[in-house]
Amino acid sequence: MPTPLLTVRNLRVSFSREGKWNEAVHGIDLDVLAGRTLGLVGESGSGKSVSSLAVMRLLNGKVSRIAADSIQIEGKEIRDFSEDQMADVRGKCISMIFQEPMTSLNPVYKCGFQVSEMILQHEEVSKTEAKHRVINLFKQVMLPRPEAIYDSYPHELSGGQKQRVMIAMAIACNPKLLIADEPTTALDVTVQLEILKLLRKLQAETGMGMIFITHDLGVVAEIADDVAVMHNGEILERGTVQQILNHPQHPYTQGLLACRPPMDVRLKRLPIVKEFLDGQWQGGKEQILRDLQITEAGRKAHLEQLYSKTPLLKVENLKTWYPLRKGVFSRVYDHVKAVDDVSLEVYEGETLGLVGESGCGKTTLGRSILRLAEPTGGKVWFDGIEVTALKGQALRDFRKQAQIVFQDPYSSLNPRITIGEAIAEPMLVHDIQKDKKKCRAMVCDLLEQVGLHAEHYDRYPHEFSGGQRQRICIARALAVNPRLVICDESVSALDVSVQAQVLNLLNRLKEERNLTYIFISHDLSVVRFMSDRVLVMYNGKPVEMNDADELFEHPQNDYTKKLIAALPGIHPKA
């Protein structure tokens, strides 16, 4: 066997909290070979990122403690390297791409300067030579107009372009090992596929080894050769990507695979990881299909009943345009057509999926329906009432009937008030319950309904995980007993295991409360699981609308076909 690029033996990482040391990583072993990719998979908090940061010595030494029997790069022990020696290792031997490029790139410096800085730090070259190399790197990572991007600030680039700049920075000094920490999590499926293809291409050209950190086994299938599955700071299972994805042995791995919404069958609900750990699904996929699959006849009967009613929501030729201005007098010279002539109907009890890439107008459409963004033209009717004509108290009354769950639960919640007060606030604003004791009892009941507990009432948002915060936002949206709920990318920031729990919760609440959903997402597998019908948007316009199963199995529009083709599968790369 060839000497691994990276060898880690018995790595242990502890963090200090309130004077006590708590071990977060419990003695893991890692091997990464040249030209191969190790997929490091697990939920948030499993220790994936901490392990890689510990190898690179990037953890805060005041609050962390790293111990290992051995950490070797190409057979050279680096465990006892000084900080100066480690600074030389970083960038030249090991480099890292982080999850969020906007926070990794300095907003006050131009992109080209930041990548040049990496080269100048590690190599003795002139600034002119460094600039020339950066422009070539930008070409290598397939950035459009590399000279222009060299002189651009991070905020002027799209998410995918910023991630390409980060990749260029990471490979600037030809590292032997690249650590990619969730580099595609926040990206659209089409951009995600491009980044994965780019990383594979760069690996083929340079022969570098790679550690690819993710919570999504579908992404691992696209890029990894070997897989290690982490949970609570331990590696539970390891093997080739084919072994792990096709024949998972550990219940946790089986659960991670199963909680991803399937594209080939319809399920009443998604299995969750805890059920696998509790031994509930020992019969595997056959048992899941037997217990949870929705039959074609069952779905047909459901849809016939659904569409026999009159639509709850009607949107007719809706437009939301934003003016572009220039000159001293701010003359309007054009418009950004965020929503451009969209018509649709949503029936009571239906879930309409709304999909498209970032910037396609799906969020603006949702906000325009609720009048959170003012439409430029067109009409919206809700239960026979023209929403676009409402003002004052009538508009406030409509907002009791229609609510929204936003993408980022942390920024949706006021950090200064308890979550109980946050959920009670809309009840008080809309005069649903003025008695504080009764209001508190109603909030506690809502907390129980969304899978939290009454004792959580007096806690603050920062005390909860991402999945719990999203449950709080759902509870707040339900506080006014709405009939329509718009879910705007409400699970996109969550691990697949937590995502499954929230999707199951949304469907359960829909049945119990007879809710109607507009479900906005760029994740097509989630949209198919949730939706009865799907509308695909591109550049503000609707390009295809159909029954969800029909649209995914027989897409008509080329853009829809492109979105579906970009979906990461759970079948490993050849």
What are these model-predicted stretches?
Residues 65-77, 378-386:
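Conserved ABC transporter NBD signature motif
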Residues 129-148, 386, 437-455, 564-565:
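Conserved ABC ATPase "signature" region
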